[in-house]
Curated annotation (Swiss-Prot):
The keyword Chaperone applies. This is Copper chaperone CopZ. Residues 2-68 form the HMA domain. Induction: Induced by copper and, to some extent, by ferric and lead ions. Cu cation binds at C13, C16. It comes from Staphylococcus aureus (strain NCTC 8325 / PS 47). One of its GO terms (molecular function) is copper ion binding. It holds the Pfam family HMA.
Length: 68
């Protein structure tokens, strides 16, 4: 199991948090995703044999947010 902290711009409310967490949790191999709105970060626990960080970034960007 691996952990990645992603910096995400544009998240400001509960809907943003829900959208990003849901998008990540729907990826096979992601076991948990936790958005911290105060610091604009997402902590993701995942199985690196099933999912790549680039897939997680794409899922976040598909929701309209920028991964920096």
């Amino acid at each position: 199991m691996s952990q990645e902290i992603l910096n995400v711009e544009g998240m400001s409310c509960g809907h943003c948090k829900s959208a990003v967490e849901s998008a990540l949790n729907n990826i096979d191999g992601v076991t948990s995703a936790d958005v911290n709105l105060e610091n604009g970060q997402v902590s993701v626990q995942y199985d690196d044999s099933k999912v790549a960080v680039s897939q997680m970034k794409d899922a976040i960007e598909d929701q309209g947010y920028d991964v920096v």
